[in-house]
């Protein structure tokens, strides 16, 4: 982990404040002054600020935040727009959002102080449930795509105008339910296992339908329930237990995958070794056979020309 990031995740200082401390020469690693913001902190490194040791946090903290519409999921915005960190208490300014909700979307957003957990959760196939409202009636084509999945060579409809994402593959929805219908709109609850860039807006945009409202209400079993807009709460004990169980499963799966890869490499090396041994044995056998044939030929030649080997020049 980069030094400034390490400091922001394990102390009261923000990343910008960490940069200033490093620049001022107030940060040491193993008692040596460090002025490189990008220094990669290694396991066993002793990081200190003004002589005080910065201890790496081992305890996990998770919060649920009800993101309001009109806020960005980012630390800062060059255009001065409101971010979620303008709404969160300052003690959470170093927390990492797990996934994204776009500017016009609202609802459940998980944040953590653990980069490793954030990475695992963002890559997970955990269910994400949304309440959405589109400006069209639901069609048979939409339902078929929700059930079967969809690949679009051109998925720009519904995407941000500056997005560089062109094509997109949509996995089948885990679940969908129609919750309201009128001539001009349809309300749905849908569950996905992905969190791709403006995924639902692009999906329905393909069918010329605009998503008017989008609210995430659940992620991996963590529910928004009645948490007010713009407010946050810590995980409950049950939620912490569930996340620790999930992380344990991920670690076990990774360990099993690593073992299988090591076994595969070992088996491949063994096959290669046996192949080389077989080829070497074949070469030696061929060489021995050639030698035997030469000796036979030489003997036959000597019999046919008994005086040849005594020939004098």
Task: Go through the PLM ranges and name each one.
Residues 26, 39-251:
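RNA pseudouridine synthases
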Residues 255-313:
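Intrinsically disordered, Lys/Arg-rich low-complexity segments
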